[in-house]
Design a protein with these regions (language model features):
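Conserved beta-strand-loop surface patch within small alpha/beta domains used
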Residues: 1-76, 85-132
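Short, well-ordered beta-to-alpha junction loops that form the rim of enzyme active sites
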Residues: 82
Length: 132
């Protein structure tokens, strides 16, 4: 199970709103204690695609985030991105691009501006989705 603080959620939400009308993205790093994963830091990255339907994280920012995780004793827990105009569930492209069955994929839907929805998913090797 993944645990995220309210302040980290608000940081992600602000980043995703600032990215509108495009998708926004980032990484999450933290610690694992048994079955529990605790997000300790949210890394706000640039969507190189500047698109409202897909994203590509800036590779330099990704590398800097991973270096920071290592420096702080964190492990990569997964990534997040927004869906400006669709629900909080993996699209076919999201499933196709899911590279790690152990990574958490967080999707923040901004489809209803007054009611953002954040969900976490796992995507296995067969591209089957499990909601966390």
């Amino acid at each position: 199970m993944l645990f995220l603080t309210k302040s980290d959620y608000e940081k992600m939400l602000a980043h995703c709103k600032e990215g509108l009308p495009n998708e926004a993205c980032g990484l999450i790093g933290g610690v694992v204690e048994g079955e529990k994963q605790y997000v300790k830091k949210v890394y706000l990255l640039t969507n190189m695609d500047e698109s409202n339907e897909h994203f590509s994280m800036d590779p330099k920012e990704q590398l800097a985030a991973v270096k920071d995780m290592r420096k702080n004793g964190y492990v990569p827990l997964g990534n997040f991105h927004s869906h400006p105009e669709s629900p909080s569930r993996p699209s076919e492209e999201d499933k196709r691009l899911a590279y790690d069955s152990k990574a958490n994929y967080l999707i923040l839907s901004l489809m209803e501006a007054d009611n953002p929805v954040l969900n976490a998913f796992l995507v296995d090797e067969e591209k089957q989705v499990t909601k966390e």
